Structures are given as C-alpha cells and as structure tokens.
C-alpha cells in the first residue's frame, strides 16, 4: 500500500508515472497492482502483467485450470500483446532498452487525471470487459471478438506486424 500511495502522491502532483515491463520475470502481485496505478504502461511482448503469477494460479486452482508450464498459455493470457490489445498497456515495444527509452520519452509530460470520475470510468470499462468476454475460454477467442485480423497468428507476429494487425482495435 505504501507504493500505491507514493504513486498516487506523485501523480497528484502532476508528474506522470510511467511503468516499463519487459524481460522474462513478469510483473505480478502487489507490484502488478502498483503498475496499474501509474499514468502509463509500456510493455514488451515478453513482459507479463497479472495480479497473480502463473505458479500461484496453478497452486490455487490446479494444473487443470492453469498450467504454469504452458508458456504459450502464460504469454497469451498475461503477455504484452494481450495486455496491449486489452488496453492495459499504452504502448508495446520490442524488448530492447532503446525502444523502451524512446517510448518513455514520448510519454513524458502526458499525465492522466487522477479523479473519482476517472476511477469510475475504469470500473465501468472493466465491468464491460467482463461481460463482453465472459464466454471466451482463451485469449485467442478474445482477440477474435475484438476483431483482430488473423488472431491465431498474433503470438507469432513481430511487433510491427502485430501493430498492423491490431491497429483498428486500439
């Protein structure tokens, strides 16, 4: 809670807080919650974001519900492309320090208002998302519902091709 409070204090001062999620470790648990409290998120395809990590979900719900060893499943549900398509990440970049730097620079000075109205809009968007995709059993079905061209090939696409495939979704 201390980190969330500090993020909110910085945002309230009008300073944009930009989170960068790359590499192979993922952004899970409390720090995943803190990441969503920031103004902007930049993620790579390899970056992952979730309230619970794959192993935690598997331990709580069983391997039948979520197999943490199924890397394709993990990336489809928590990976950068999915988070970008769902609107959780503002930008997706190659997993490269220079790409992250350039993207972060592009967002400097772009703070988002931290108001009750903004929080209520986010809650409504999440409720709408749950209703819209409640019948989807896999991320590829969500991508199809979003209208992503050739959704089954999203995991194989390089970032430029992926951005082309998904341009109309965002």
Kindly label every feature range from the protein language model.
Residues 105-170:
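Intrinsically disordered, low-complexity segments enriched in small/flexible residues
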